[in-house]
Amino acid sequence: NLQGNEVDDYMDVIEQYAKVENKEELRKGLSRLLYRQNEKLPAAKNPAQPDLADLLVPGHVMLAEVTDWKEAVSLGARPLLEKGLIQERYLQTMIRQILIQRPYIMVADGVIIAHAAIDAGVNETCMSLVRLPHKIAIHDYLQADIILILATVDFQNHLKALSQFNERVSEPEGLARIRRAADADALRAVLIGKEG
């Protein structure tokens, strides 16, 4: 197995010059990296991309009353952390990026997508969403009341769900229904297009 041999070669070099705290995690990370570089993405090898309903499962959609954006992002990440879908460092990286890089992450009026790199502690592609009663300042450069947390294991797996989300929030009436939803279940139903 060519890729396995490459991973072993990289492991040998790294271990010569660095103290490796967790060999198994390093091996997994190198395997993912090498696989991604060698991947040609043939359709047969690509499992179907999850849609929005697959990722925004019950318990991943919340209504909250917080005024601090870091608290809102942390709240959104909580179910993902509790299920082991992301690691704590993914949450910290999202917050640090907003603080330091001030990325433009707004996709519609008052709607932001908080995310970090695929190698920043993602175990499984996942999403969660927090809706606030009114817009709050996101590090004093954006205003948002809807925060989508996105984590993806590669550059493709989240695209279908993200496209569906963008469709929902890009139309004013869809956005209004998201803001009017009375509870988390109703909000999820609006988001995934299953409202009664």
What are these regions (language model features)?
Residues N1-G196:
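Cytosolic covalent-transfer regions centered on His/Cys nucleophiles
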